[in-house]
């Protein structure tokens, strides 16, 4: 019941117990109280009996005291949605945190929504071209699909996400929503300023911006980190339903969503499951992931960075995420150590739509040929390490030479990484990617040195670089 009043009876970190006199608020209702002169939102998680509810705080609870008055809002957390949120940074409860004044939205939506029903969903499969060779060729993204970027710490997940926002926001006229979940505040700040520089956010006229940002970073309490992905998703759903276009929804990092859930789970008195995660891990993940889908109105394509604890893909958090994905882009430390960026593992990454019926026979065949050569090279590496290259047959030597060229050709300079590489980013059209790799596999460029294939765009750049290298050597 809206406006029912209660009192705080117990505070344990991010978990607050509230006792009501008569009407109990429903599960997932938002309650409000004041703490240090600021509005503090609590979300009901459990009914404990004796008219007491256990809630999760969406902000710090330092300074909150027993006996503080709490009001039931009568519904779930609601956030502003629509064009007014473009170019803005919001927090989990929809308040602006960018010091640009209030968000003058005409509509608000509850962050907890049911997933679209079967008859509302769309079933077509189309490729979403990113301009990044290794992704478009070997693990293509589908429109309205869910894509996971897997990788340990520091192998380039956030850089790849920023490049995708950069490429797709420019090529696509659609909107993007970026949810920063439990990641570094510095990265969130960098991303915001880079978006201003690249005109994705237009400060003079915010409503012409292409992106809305929702942040719940590492320093936030677990309640905020466990809900901020839902806040971002609610914004994306409204853009999809209102504009009927492809909306891009970026989550960095989906692991932190699970981690925040596990932090509050023990405080809520649940018995932990494998590796200390919450027993409701699969349920929490499913409730969010099932909302990310294509409907008849439009699509939400979601790209989610997945931190892999200790590089262990069998950990319950990444393993549960795998089940929901249409494509996986696995970033490998071994490849980043070779200096090949993006450090995408061409053999571990996969996509549901790498299928001749979706991408076409030629694309499928070239991708499989490239993977075949790289797989053969991988299996020969032990022999090379022990006996050296000279012990290989002529055919294997040729395979190794081509594989090393392919490996380098899968690297690419990024716009957003210009400060590291010193060279301008390139986007390669899908047709060029397919024809270039087809020619390399067929041996048409066996005469070029492997260094010419490193950090370039299309095959024309390889030829130009090889000529430059020959001129310098002479």
From Swiss-Prot:
Taxonomic placement: Bacteria, Pseudomonadati, Pseudomonadota, Alphaproteobacteria, Rhodobacterales
Q: According to its record, what are the GO cellular component terms?
A: plasma membrane; proton-transporting ATP synthase complex
Q: Provide this UniProt record's keywords sorted from A to Z.
A: ATP synthesis, ATP-binding, Cell inner membrane, Cell membrane, CF(1), Hydrogen ion transport, Ion transport, Membrane, Nucleotide-binding, Translocase, Transport
Q: Where does ATP bind?
A: 151-158
Query: What name does this protein carry?
Result: ATP synthase subunit beta
User: Is the Ion transport keyword given for this protein?
Assistant: yes
Entry annotated with the keyword ATP-binding: yes
The record's function comment reads: Produces ATP from ADP in the presence of a proton gradient across the membrane. The catalytic sites are hosted primarily by the beta subunits.
């Amino acid at each position: 019941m809206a406006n029912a009043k209660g009192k705080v009876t117990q505070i344990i970190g991010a978990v607050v117990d509230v006792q009501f006199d008569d009407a109990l608020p429903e599960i997932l209702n938002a309650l409000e109280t004041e703490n240090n002169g600021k509005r503090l939102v609590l979300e009901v998680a459990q009914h404990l009996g004796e008219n007491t509810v256990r809630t999760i705080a969406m902000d710090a609870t330092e300074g909150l005291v027993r006996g503080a008055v709490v009001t039931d809002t009568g519904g779930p957390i609601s956030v502003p949605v629509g064009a007014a949120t473009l170019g803005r940074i919001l927090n989990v409860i929809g308040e602006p945190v960018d010091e640009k004044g209030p968000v003058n939205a005409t509509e608000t939506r509850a962050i907890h929504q049911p997933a679209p029903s079967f008859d509302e969903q769309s079933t077509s499969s189309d490729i979403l071209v990113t301009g990044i060779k290794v992704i478009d060729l070997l693990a293509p993204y589908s429109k309205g699909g869910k894509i996971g970027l897997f990788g340990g710490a520091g192998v380039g997940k956030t850089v790849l996400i920023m490049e995708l926002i950069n490429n797709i926001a420019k090529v696509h006229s659609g909107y993007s929503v970026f949810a920063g979940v439990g990641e570094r505040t510095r990265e969130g700040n960098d991303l915001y300023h880079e978006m201003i520089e690249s005109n994705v956010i237009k400060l003079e006229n915010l409503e012409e911006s292409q992106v809305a940002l929702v942040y719940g970073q590492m320093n936030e309490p677990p309640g905020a980190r466990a809900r901020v992905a839902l806040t971002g998703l609610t914004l994306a759903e409204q853009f999809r339903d209102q504009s009927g276009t492809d909306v891009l929804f970026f989550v960095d990092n989906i692991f932190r969503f699970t981690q925040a859930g596990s932090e509050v789970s023990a405080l809520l008195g649940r018995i932990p499951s494998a590796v200390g995660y919450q027993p409701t891990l699969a349920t929490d993940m499913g409730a969010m992931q099932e909302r990310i889908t294509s409907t008849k109105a439009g699509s939400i394509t979601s790209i989610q960075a997945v931190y892999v604890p200790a590089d262990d893909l069998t950990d319950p958090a990444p393993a549960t995420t795998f089940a929901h994905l249409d494509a996986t882009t696995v970033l490998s430390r071994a490849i980043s150590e070779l200096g090949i960026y993006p450090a995408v593992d061409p053999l571990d990454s996969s996509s549901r739509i790498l299928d001749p019926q979706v991408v076409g026979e030629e694309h499928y065949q070239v991708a499989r040929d490239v993977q075949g050569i790289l797989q053969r090279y991988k299996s020969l590496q032990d022999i090379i390490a022990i006996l050296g290259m000279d012990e290989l047959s002529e055919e294997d030597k040729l395979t190794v030479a081509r594989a090393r060229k392919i490996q380098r050709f899968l690297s690419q300079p990024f716009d957003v990484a210009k400060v590291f590489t010193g060279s301008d980013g390139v986007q390669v059209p899908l047709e060029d990617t397919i024809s270039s790799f087809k020619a390399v596999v067929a041996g048409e460029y066996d005469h070029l040195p492997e260094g010419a294939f490193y950090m370039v765009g299309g095959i024309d750049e390889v030829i130009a670089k090889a000529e430059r290298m020959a001129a310098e050597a002479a």
